[in-house]
């Protein structure tokens, strides 16, 4: 550990002249895991970006260059999504106490409108409009009002922002570009991709998905769902962890949509972590305009169960794209805790393992250090200093098992069996840890409940990116 610390110190020293020169020239240095400065997508990430899609009827999107950050003159940073008809809409927001102005504005609007009559969402990147006081709330309101003018519907637009905290928006620049954003709206794949690019900050690739589905009562109707999300850092659940917009042309009631979204978010965006930080701006919103027709979906029906399942699977895949783009990440890691006495205990254990810096750095170093996994498991349910370990009956060391599960379909590598260490085949462990995707499986031997989290490793690059973020 001391040697690793020294290596980190010398790497830091070597980087300083490069960082200082880059700042003098008004740019940040190139980074191995960051998006290239010309806006192109790294070769290793292109496989996650769709080249086509099937998008919901009646929705149009655009991505427009504003220059919210003074250094940005080439990349779109204002996204607009609009429905041709008013939607039922719902959103889940951050639980961070310092909630950003757009979060406050959008939450209040949805409450006033009772999740109905929402037609647009406008999103800027480059500035979070968080911790900006009354002026920030006024700016968020102005953004919504300008979008409302374009649709001709008052109080029909929610707002999202992402970027640096504690700075005011260049609101006049944004407002001047809203008509252009509206004029550029379209329903093609390129339009959706442009919007997905516009909400990115430190993301190395735009995160966009679409698919079709059917409902039991309308087997002849093809419904569509599409979503875009952004996030690469400051990702840890205590609501939704990032920005996400999902739209469907299925007809969903205003009572059913919020409950379906909450269920989906708890099992997707609330089950990922990159660095354990919960943002001030986290928002995931869901819009349903009913443009595809068919019977309206209400709670307590087979249609509702089917839609909720589709939404949950879709949201999970969308959330996993965020983990695959974790700042500086080289691995996508599934942490699965099974045989738990309760789902809550399984979630807390999986979450603790997934955000442990020691686990994440070991994975980056391709080190089969299962002791760190066991350590995180052991303290995961201790909520207060001095709490007796007898107060944590959900974990029994003599029943606990830990394994690596390869993603290539080969046999699991058992590391701990019933609390006893296995003789680890280091060569086999090295093969598994060379893979981009891997799974950590913890069996508690206490019941039949389980939980899954998705995370990534920690590399030197994570520190470089976040040490230089504001430039």
Curated annotation (Swiss-Prot):
Entry protein name: Arginine biosynthesis bifunctional protein ArgJ, mitochondrial
Enzyme class of the recorded protein, top EC level: transferase
Chain segment of the transit peptide: 1-33
Pathway: Amino-acid biosynthesis; L-arginine biosynthesis; L-ornithine and N-acetyl-L-glutamate from L-glutamate and N(2)-acetyl-L-ornithine (cyclic): step 1/1; Amino-acid biosynthesis; L-arginine biosynthesis; N(2)-acetyl-L-ornithine from L-glutamate: step 1/4
Subcellular location: Mitochondrion matrix
Active site: 241
UniProt-recorded Gene Ontology molecular function terms: glutamate N-acetyltransferase activity; L-glutamate N-acetyltransferase activity
Recorded catalytic activity of this chain's protein: N(2)-acetyl-L-ornithine + L-glutamate = N-acetyl-L-glutamate + L-ornithine; L-glutamate + acetyl-CoA = N-acetyl-L-glutamate + CoA + H(+)
Keywords: Acyltransferase, Amino-acid biosynthesis, Arginine biosynthesis, Autocatalytic cleavage, Mitochondrion, Multifunctional enzyme, Transferase, Transit peptide
GO terms of biological process kind: L-arginine biosynthetic process; ornithine biosynthetic process
Entry superkingdom: Eukaryota
Post-translational modification comment from the UniProt entry: The alpha and beta chains are autoproteolytically processed from a single precursor protein within the mitochondrion.
């Amino acid at each position: 550990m001391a040697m690793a610390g020294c290596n980190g110190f010398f790497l830091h020293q070597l980087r300083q002249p490069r960082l200082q020169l880059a700042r003098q020239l008004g740019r940040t240095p190139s980074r191995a895991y960051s998006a290239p400065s010309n806006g192109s997508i790294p070769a290793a990430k292109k496989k996650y970006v769709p080249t086509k899609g099937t998008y919901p009827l009646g929705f149009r999107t655009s991505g427009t260059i504003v220059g919210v950050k003074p250094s940005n003159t080439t990349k779109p940073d204002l996204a607009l999504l609009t429905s041709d008809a008013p939607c039922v809409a719902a959103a889940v927001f951050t639980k961070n106490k310092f909630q950003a102005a757009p979060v406050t504005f959008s939450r209040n609007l949805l409450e006033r409108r009772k999740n109905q009559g929402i037609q647009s969402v406008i999103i800027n990147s480059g500035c979070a409009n968080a911790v900006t006081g009354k002026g920030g709330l006024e700016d968020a309101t102005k953004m919504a009002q300008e979008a409302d003018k374009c649709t001709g519907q008052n109080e029909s637009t929610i707002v999202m922002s992402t970027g640096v905290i504690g700075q005011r928006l260049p609101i006049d620049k944004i407002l001047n570009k809203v008509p252009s954003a509206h004029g550029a709206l379209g329903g093609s794949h390129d339009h959706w991709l442009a919007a997905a690019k516009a909400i990115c900050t430190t993301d190395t690739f735009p995160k966009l998905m679409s698919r079709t589905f059917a409902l039991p009562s309308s087997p002849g109707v093809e419904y569509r769902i599409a979503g875009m999300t952004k996030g690469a850092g400051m990702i840890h659940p205590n609501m939704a962890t990032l920005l996400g917009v999902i739209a469907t042309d299925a007809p969903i009631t205003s009572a059913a949509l919020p409950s379906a979204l909450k269920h989906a978010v708890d099992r997707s965006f609330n089950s990922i972590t990159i660095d354990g930080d919960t943002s001030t701006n986290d928002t995931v919103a869901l819009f349903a305009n009913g443009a595809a027709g068919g019977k309206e979906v209400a709670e307590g029906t087979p249609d509702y169960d089917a839609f909720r399942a589709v939404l949950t699977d879709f949201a999970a895949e969308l959330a996993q794209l965020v983990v695959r783009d974790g700042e500086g990440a080289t691995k996508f890691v599934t942490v699965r805790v099974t045989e738990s006495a309760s789902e809550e205990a399984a979630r807390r254990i999986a979450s603790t393992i997934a955000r442990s810096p020691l686990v994440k750095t070991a994975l980056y170093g391709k080190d089969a250090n299962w002791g760190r996994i066991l350590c995180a498991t052991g303290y995961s349910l201790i909520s207060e200093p001095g709490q007796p370990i007898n107060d944590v009956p959900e974990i029994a060391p003599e029943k606990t098992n830990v394994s690596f599960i390869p993603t290539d379909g080969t046999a699991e590598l058992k590391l701990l069996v019933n609390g006893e260490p296995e003789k680890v085949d280091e060569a086999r462990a090295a093969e598994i840890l060379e893979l981009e995707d891997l799974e950590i499986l913890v069996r508690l031997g206490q019941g039949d409940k389980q939980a899954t989290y998705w995370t990534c490793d920690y590399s030197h690059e994570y520190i470089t990116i976040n040490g230089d973020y504001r430039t």
